[in-house]
Regions:
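N-terminal accessory segments that target, anchor, or regulate ATP-driven/P-loop NTPase machines
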Residues: 1-37, 337, 343-344
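Hydrophobic face residues on amphipathic alpha-helices
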Residues: 2, 11, 15, 20, ...
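C-terminal output helix
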Residues: 2-15, 154, 171, 198, ...
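Residues within helix-turn-helix
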Residues: 9, 153, 260, 326-327, ...
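AAA+ ATPase active-site-proximal loops
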Residues: 32-173, 177-184, 189, 213, ...
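Conserved AAA+ ATPase core "coupling" helix
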Residues: 110, 191-233
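Bacterial C-terminal helix-turn-helix
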Residues: 240, 298-347
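Conserved C-terminal helix/linker of AAA+ ATPases
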Residues: 266, 273-288
Length: 347
């Protein structure tokens, strides 16, 4: 049979719709790629302090040496570790990050090294640990100063012998590069008997110190621009600008929470901003007033229960630290693991 001839306009409309659909698909792919690129965490800055860190990291990357990244909370120690991994021969293998302070002591060993079925009560199936998941790649151990003595011994064996034993299992060879990080003074921890001296020297083959943001203020405008791009994309809004007066306020602030605190401030500004430029009013009071580091005053009546004093003190310190548990622990003079435990008790 012979179909009736199609009208010319019908053909034109069909072609146009197909073209528009392809254009929209291409635009959608482009936007997704742009968001993926913008939201990828990366080291931003060009200050001498940051360049020194990257110079050492670049030299260390091709080697197999263990690296210890030092620095205050929020300075980007994990980003330095990722930089080392991405510039090493292990770049195509996994990068596995572990926050040692966020894992309860009772399961930390099994979490790192894995366990066999029936190794302990509740071990209903075999589970591989973080070392196994990082095989061929890099294992980043953040808050290394929080390791328990028993786990310190097992980690030392990995670094010395290149092998470990899963809980309830046989010896396994470890093909993993270890990069560790801490905001503690590990030499002081060694002197106090809380950290093994032999493990410290095994970790401290190459030391890199991530500088606090207050020592690289010239990077703040670059970081602000970067985070504006990230959070404008995440919140599906047009690109915002930060005028000179806003940048001046941000540059003058002391940033006790470092880059992580700056990122949180910019995310907040993107959400609250009503125009196409961030204003000083979009910034938190503590940043506008420049009173970072001045502790809030808490008053308690005589006879206030100790647990109530502790609860209010921890919550106020967390508020001051903008939810950064590591920074709050530093301000309180306790370990990060302790603050996680205390928060669990308060809930």
């Amino acid at each position: 049979f012979v179909e009736k001839p199609l009208k010319r306009m019908t053909i034109v409309k069909s072609v146009r719709k197909a073209a528009e659909r392809q254009s929209l698909l291409a635009e959608n792919r482009s936007l997704r790629n742009e968001i993926k690129l913008l939201t990828r965490r990366e080291i931003v800055g060009s200050s001498p302090a940051l360049r020194r860190v990257l110079d050492i990291a670049t030299q260390a990357a091709p080697s197999s040496a263990t690296v210890l990244v030092l620095g205050e909370s929020g300075t980007g120690k994990e980003l330095v570790a990722r930089f080392i991994h991405e510039h090493s021969s292990r770049a195509k293998a996994p990068f596995v990050a572990v926050n040692c302070s966020a894992i309860p002591e009772t399961i930390l060993e099994a979490e790192l090294f894995g366990h066999e079925r029936g190794a302990f009560t509740g071990a209903l199936a075999r589970r591989e640990g973080r070392f196994a998941r990082a095989a061929g790649g890099t294992l980043f151990l953040d808050e290394i100063g929080e390791l328990t003595p028993s786990v310190q011994v097992k980690l030392l064996r990995v670094l010395q012998e290149g092998e470990y034993e899963p809980v309830g299992g046989d010896t396994v060879r470890a093909d993993v590069r270890v990069v560790a990080a801490t905001n503690k003074d590990l030499r002081a921890e060694v002197a106090a008997g809380r950290f093994r001296e032999d493990l410290f020297y095994r970790l401290n083959v190459i030391a890199v110190t991530a500088p606090p943001l207050r020592s690289r203020r010239e990077d703040i405008p670059l970081l602000v621009d970067h985070f504006l791009g990230v959070y404008c994309a995440k919140n599906n809004r047009g690109r915002l600008e930060a005028p000179r007066d806003v940048l001046q306020v941000l540059t003058d602030y002391s940033w006790p929470g470092n880059v992580r605190e700056l990122e949180n401030v910019i995310e907040r500004a993107v959400v609250l901003c009503r125009g196409d430029k961030v204003t000083v009013d979009d910034l938190p009071d503590v940043v506008r007033q420049g009173d970072a580091g001045e502790p809030s005053t808490l008053t308690f009546s005589v006879g206030t229960p100790l647990d109530e004093v502790e609860r209010r003190l921890i919550r106020e310190t967390l508020r001051h630290a903008r939810g950064d548990k590591s920074l709050a622990a530093q301000l309180l003079g306790i370990s990060t693991r302790t603050i996680y435990r205390k928060l669990g008790e308060l809930e």
